[in-house]
Amino acid sequence: MKIKITKSGLKKDEVFFRTEFGEGRGIWCGAPMGPDTETDVEFELSELLMRWVDILPVPATEFDIRLEGDKVVFTGVLENIEEDGTGFLRLGESLVMFECLGEPMALGVFVEVQVRDVRIYPLSI
């Protein structure tokens, strides 16, 4: 996914970013980059998420990334959840992978995934 870094945060390597779907925050895991830098990245959601708590169905029809307090909220289509709990959220052409536990959820519907910890890795294209 293409992001534009908008500013540095207070934590070590924390950055705020903008995408075509909205704005968020995360920990930058690459060579230092300054504000106004655009780059392709992959998001890592390293928390173990609970279905029906951190992942909730929503009546949305558009992809979204936004900040809500200390959380980053990703709104996208729940593509798949494998038997081992690995889940995939579609945001436009990009997939965000996460680990989850809990009761089954319908696939192919819009959900919100709420996380506190987002790691951002630059993609080498």
Regions found by a protein language model. Give the residues of each.
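Beta-strand/loop nucleic-acid-binding surfaces
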Residues: R18-G34, R90-V109, Q114-R119
